[in-house]
A protein has these predicted regions:
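N-terminal presequence-like segments and the immediate start of the first folded domain
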Residues: 1-95, 100-200
Length: 200
């Protein structure tokens, strides 16, 4: 009984600075592991000192390559963090949240019923495929800004490690590459849904 409680007790996971994951200044852990569950804190492309990490800062932050560079930085850190928990980002990730910075819609556009953020996430999705082959249940939201200056992307995840097979339901969304639902053992994970016709 005591051994079982040790396995399920929450454990903070720090992959270590040698893994290349910057240590955040905020009072939280990069990951918490409890039983087979792993909860990953949101990752940004930041050095947690100056804002956007200098290694990916570009002259024109509006270029699509900027989002791809941030995606590679963020997903690489997530993969290292998840590996430190004993899980695999592709095999064990069951749910993902993605936050993109956009100045749209404006208040006027929103009042007119237009809530499209006006950004292409294709560079992010292209990079994500290098780390995650599956199309996981997900949520994608646009925000005016993130906590660290000049960052345009934040991603957080849940992983679940057990011996069960992963079963997905429905066809992947053609734009965001996520499935409506995923089942792992007794657990079912759903994508967020909105009143959008993705066939247009």
């Amino acid at each position: 009984m005591e051994e079982d409680s040790k396995k399920t007790a929450p454990e903070a996971i720090w992959p270590g600075l040698e893994a290349g994951v910057p240590k955040p200044l905020m009072p939280y852990s990069p990951a918490i592991k409890a039983g087979g569950w792993v909860f990953i804190a949101g990752q940004l492309a930041s050095d947690f000192k100056t804002g956007l990490d200098p290694s990916i800062r570009q002259v024109n932050p509006f270029l699509k390559e900027q989002l791809a560079s941030e995606a590679d930085f963020v997903l690489g850190n997530l993969a290292d963090t998840i590996k430190a928990t004993g899980c695999d980002i592709d095999k064990d990730m069951v749910r993902i949240w993605q936050w993109f910075v956009s100045s749209r819609p404006t208040y006027k556009e929103f009042e007119q019923g237009n809530n499209w953020p006006g950004i292409s996430v294709a560079p992010y999705i292209s990079v994500r495929k290098n780390y995650i082959d599956q199309c996981p249940p997900s949520s994608s939201l646009s925000v005016r800004e993130l906590m660290w200056r000049d960052t345009n992307l934040e991603v957080d995840m849940i992983c679940f490690a057990d011996d069960n097979e992963t079963t997905t339901f429905g066809d992947p969304n053609p734009h965001m590459q996520h499935v409506p639902a995923l089942r792992r053992g007794d657990w079912v994970f759903l994508s967020s849904e909105g009143p959008v016709d993705w066939t247009d």
